[in-house]
Amino acid sequence: MGKSYWIWYPGDFELYHGMKQNFSRVERGFGWPAFWKSEGFRNRVAFRRTYQLEKETSFTVYSNAIGHVLVGDKKYSFGKKIVCGPGEVAVGVHTGCIEAFPCIYVEGEVICSDKGWIVEDYDKEPLPAGKSKYFTEPNQNPTVWEYSEKVYEPVSVTEYNGGTLFETELNAVLEAEFKNGYQPVLICCGESREEAIDPVHCYYSWQPDKETGKCPCCAVRFAYIPDCKPGEVILRANHQYVDIPVKASFHCGEDRLNQIWSVAEHTFRLCSGIFFIDGVKRDKWIWSGDAYQSFFVNRYLMADADIDQRTILALRGNDPMTKHINTIVDYSLLWLLGVDYHNEGYGDRDFLELVYPKMVSLMGFCNGRRDEHGFLIGKEKDWVYIDWADMDKDGPLCAEQMLYAACFRAMEEISEQIGKDGSVYRAEYEKLTAVIEKFFWDEEKGAYIDSFTSGRRNVTRHANIFAILFSIADEKQQEKILKNVLENDEIPAITTPYFNFFELDVLCRMGKLTEVLDKIRSYWGGMLDLGAVTFWEEYDPSVPKEEQYDMYGDHFGKSLCHAWAASPIYFLAKYFAGLDLVNKDGVTYILKPQMQYFTELDCTLPVGSNGVVRLVWDGEILEITPNADGGILELGEQKLSLVRGETRRVNI
């Protein structure tokens, strides 16, 4: 038999499962579907392929839809063996489904649903069919994701205030077993002990299903059953997850950093399922800005291109584009920059050609929302986010224009890469950066201001960080920004792990590795000191411990397991272990290890889809063992080639 996959209209699988993900939020007993435009999948599609058959062959088509198989001018039912050939045979599969996206599975020696099928929706030009490595058997249903499962017993069971407190794992389906028959008990769940023992304010409280004893899946580290003695009810946690292998490992001579890496990895894996989601507790939604940072961590931890691509397709939706992604202006821009970063890491030409028209239409949508100066502005019902921070958002926001400019440059490069003319994007980039300098650069302050329309000339870190990160500021301006903004304690500090990611990335690029490592130890280590087992959505060290879980006006509103807080993996891997992917001129990756920050190190990192590289440092000798092609080791001015399977040893 040929290798078959379930196939569908490209993007529909992601839109369908993305819809289910974004409709999964439940809070204190009520459902809360995501508050942005929900993109629909196609209900009527046709699959086509023409074969040149040397001899007679047979095949069978399975589908979740109604429809038929057309071979020549004869129609056949799904599930029936079809015999055809020899000669030219045109196969068409016509499907319609109201409940979900139509998909088919073609089983046969020669005619099978592998790469080569095209699909059309009777509206746009045919496209190569979509598929997934997770759906390769005829008895599967691509509309139902088959999760891996692992059952965890509680790590502790204690009596508290007349009830029973269980400590368990995160993001699980709780299963209750009753010693004396079913009881309609209330199970209060929490990411923290404080939340679980507060039945009034906890986010999740359930009565187990009478037949199965199960509760809905939720973020649960602690579970509390009031008015229940230990032993009367037995709880287990059934963790459902997508089994994406971790390719990286990290161990150094400092326990603090090892623990930070481990907790960041645990945090990130919990937020990595069918898609990258923000966190496992509150939203469980697919946010573009959160996903953008997840692409960076993914490259250095799992290097799984598929989850990147599923997330990208679920976020963008269909053309024409009528609303910003997640309603947020900057999240539309970060979607495009995320495609650029993904392409840099994995270089999947087929995926790039699939998504390129969506990139073009997104830029066209944004270009239609400019003011008289050419600045991108928020229209009615658009959310200009950037960060949870006080900044002057009167009129065009400088930080937004930095992202907008970066998108023009990314579009130029990607257009040229796939044989399109990128000059129009270069011209737009040059025009926009010129007016950014004219209206937002303040020479007296030595920094970019938030807004020029309010007259306040307010300076925050955000626009200035983006100016360096995307190379919009020149070298002299960057030095001024470093002094006047990044190293200036009078400029309000960043308090979210989300924007700490951007700030620390800039500091690393400017050679401030000591400061970055100290920040990783203190900021992420500060969460560990407060008992964190996963990293949080937000952390302000100045806030009293009893108020740390407060957010959005809710006593337990803060997510304590948030993907954007896993960024230490990226910093330690890229800037300290020193791995950078380049994919240019025959060089796949460059390794610039900074061993002066470690007493010892044993680290394995993925090199895109190309393999892995291992670094072992004992304080004197550095051993590099690559299982990837095209590597260069840079030690100061010295450049040494790295050959797959050969260990290189150097004294440092």
Spans of features found by a protein language model:
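Extracellular/oxidizing-compartment recognition motifs
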Residues: M1-I274, D290, D306-I307, T311
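Short, solvent-exposed loop/turn segments at the edges of secondary structure
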Residues: N64, E99, C218-V220, G289, ...
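Non-catalytic C-terminal accessory modules of carbohydrate-active enzymes
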Residues: L127, W145, T514-I652
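Aromatic-rich carbohydrate-recognition surfaces in CAZymes
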Residues: Y203-G231, R256-I260, F268-C271, I286-S415
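The feature captures the catalytic groove of carbohydrate-active enzymes
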Residues: P208-E211, N318-L334, N367-E430, A434-L504, ...
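Structural helix-adjacent loops and short alpha-helical linkers that scaffold large soluble proteins
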Residues: V233-I234, D255-L257, R299-I312, N343-M363, ...
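Carbohydrate-binding/catalytic loop surfaces
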Residues: V280-Q293, L333-G338, Y346, F375-A399, ...
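Extracellular polysaccharide-recognition and catalytic grooves
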Residues: V459-D550, D554-F556
